[in-house]
From Swiss-Prot:
Keywords attached to this entry: Disulfide bond, Glycoprotein, Glycosidase, Hydrolase, Signal
Disulphide bridges: C211-C219
MF annotations from Gene Ontology: beta-D-fucosidase activity; beta-galactosidase activity; beta-glucosidase activity
Name by which UniProt lists this protein: Beta-glucosidase 27
Top class in the EC scheme: hydrolase
Naturally occurring in which organism (per UniProt): Oryza sativa subsp. japonica (Rice)
EC numbers on record: 3.2.1.21
Active site, UniProt feature: E192, E407
Family to which this protein belongs: Belongs to the glycosyl hydrolase 1 family.
Length: 499
């Protein structure tokens, strides 16, 4: 009940934009703090068969019946490929400082490799997009890989299950740095590697959709106890080699920065029992530390080494040194918090899988009460204090890095029976961002080096396995006509960010 009363109070408070602008606004943050909003190629661009683009694993996966909740796909998405110039006007209308987007690997290298040819039309599209972003006074924050492996590499050698992916990714990154790095000063190698590896190779709920038959009969045959870790290992090596290339070949002249974007929930002990407190650590290690520990310390968390054993790949001494320190900043995506309850004994018949290797039952409910107000997406519950806790944890454990909150947002149902005029009144989203910005500000005051905050997402988009069933955007998109409408939250941000 406490969180409900708080949410109602905050909604009432932030509904008065003028009052918020006078009390809490962009000037409540450091002068160089960056506010932005985000997107991703497959979720936005559409035009999958235009401009020389080759297919990605998401083109394949989304067209398999039953993989996407509403049977949809990203063939058109929000048609950003054709509408980006007018769409970017919304970003400036909201007084944002930056625009985050990803480059589609298969739009640059349709066959995934340099030898397969560089697509000049793809280069031209992203050059134009970058120039349009900059011409509006916005900073481009560019992600090199956001889940969309070229299908050609999946067919050729199972992509991230093979060490061959390292060279091909570095070659692709090299093209991006060379063609766009004179204007792009903030690069992310990968977005949410944990989601990509756990979903794509553990549960099979993300492309390429692989898992063990004992996890699901609906997956492509895989190995949920091994493949997530193999894919993650090769991804980390690809990331580190790309960072080394950028630092050795481009950084001195282009004067940019490069990092990687992680994702994690925050976790709260289910009870005061010591076992549940230990479960919090294991939860963080398996979700966050899996990809953070190697780039900070040069190896996986000790808890993972202990529980996963020989299924967890080992770095050579040279690889450990390569991976360690391979970032200038950390992107951090946060959406929700869970309770962590220890599983004291692993059932003897339970077969290995990433999802159960941590010996933790993660839940948003305790005694039937949710940890916070539920979003439309079933796994998300609003718990803004968790963002502050995650930021403080990152500062303490991971050597006090520069951090950009690269994604933070909430969604509502895509309900076609609600008139658009009503659907635009997203007070819940305003409350969500207000709360999370307040806790971000508090973390900064406590010494966390948070450099920016990006909303997820810019406009209602294709949300992977959920399709178009939910709406995360600040801008409403009519799925029938693709016409754009500004939600109330977009006006709130315009006022909050007014200079």
């Amino acid at each position: 009940m406490r969180w409900l009363l708080l949410a109602l109070f905050l909604v009432a408070l932030v509904s008065n934009g003028a009052a918020v602008h006078g009390a809490f606004n962009r000037f409540s943050f450091p002068e160089d703090f960056i506010f932005g909003t985000g997107s991703a190629a497959y979720q936005y661009e559409g035009a999958v068969n235009e401009g020389g683009r080759g297919p990605s694993i998401w083109d394949t996966y989304a067209h398999i019946p039953g993989k996407v909740e509403d049977g949809s796909n990203g063939d058109v998405a929000v048609d950003f490929y054709h509408r980006y110039k007018e769409d970017l006007n919304f970003v400036t209308d909201m007084n944002m400082d930056a625009f985050r987007f990803s480059i589609a690997w298969s739009r640059i290298l349709p066959n995934g490799t340099i030898s397969g040819g560089i697509n000049k039309e793809g280069i031209a599209f992203y050059n134009s997009l970058i120039n349009e972003v900059i011409s509006r006074g916005l900073k481009p924050f560019v992600t090199i890989f956001h889940f969309d492996t070229p299908q050609a590499l999946e067919d050729k050698y199972r992509s991230f299950l093979s060490e061959n992916i390292v060279k091909d990714f570095v070659d692709y990154a090299d093209v991006c740095f060379r063609e766009f790095g004179d204007r792009v000063k903030s690069w992310n190698t990968f977005n949410e590697p944990m989601i990509f590896c756990a979903g794509g190779y553990g549960s099979g709920t993300k492309a390429p959709g692989r898992c063990s038959p004992y996890v699901s009969k609906k997956c492509a045959p895989g190995d949920s106890g091994n493949e997530p870790y193999v894919a993650g290992h090769n991804l980390l090596l690809a990331h580190a080699e790309a960072v080394r290339l950028y630092r050795q070949k481009y950084q001195a002249t282009q004067k940019g920065q490069i990092g990687i974007t992680q994702v994690s929930h925050w976790f709260v002990p289910y009870s005061d029992a010591a076992a549940d407190k230990h479960a919090v650590r294991r939860s963080l290690d398996f979700m966050y530390g899996w990809f953070m520990d190697p780039i900070v310390f040069g190896d996986y968390p000790g808890t993972m080494r202990k529980l996963v054993g020989d299924r967890l790949p080992k770095f050579t001494a040279e690889q450990s040194e390569l991976v360690k320190g391979s970032y200038d900043f950390i992107g951090l995506n946060y959406y929700t918090t869970n309770y962590a309850k220890s599983v004291l004994r692993r059932p003897s018949k339970l077969k290995p899988a990433y999802a159960t290797d941590n010996w933790v039952n993660q839940t948003a409910y305790r005694n039937g009460v949710p940890i916070g107000p539920p979003a439309f997406t079933k796994i998300f519950f609003t718990y803004a204090p968790g963002l502050r806790e995650l930021l403080l944890y990152t500062k303490r454990k991971y050597n006090d890095p520069d951090i950009y909150i690269a994604e933070n947002g909430t969604d509502e149902a895509n309900n076609s029976t609600i008139p658009i005029a009503e659907a635009l009144k997203d007070d819940n989203r305003i409350s969500f961002h207000y709360q999370h910005l307040r806790f971000t500000q508090l973390a900064i005051k406590e010494g966390v080096k948070v450099k920016g905050y990006f909303t997820w997402t810019f406009m209602d988009d294709f949300e992977w396995g959920d399709g178009y069933t939910g709406r995360f955007g600040l801008i409403y998109v009519d799925r029938e006509t693709l016409k754009r409408y500004r939600k109330k939250s977009s006006y709130w941000f315009a006022d909050f960010l007014k200079r």
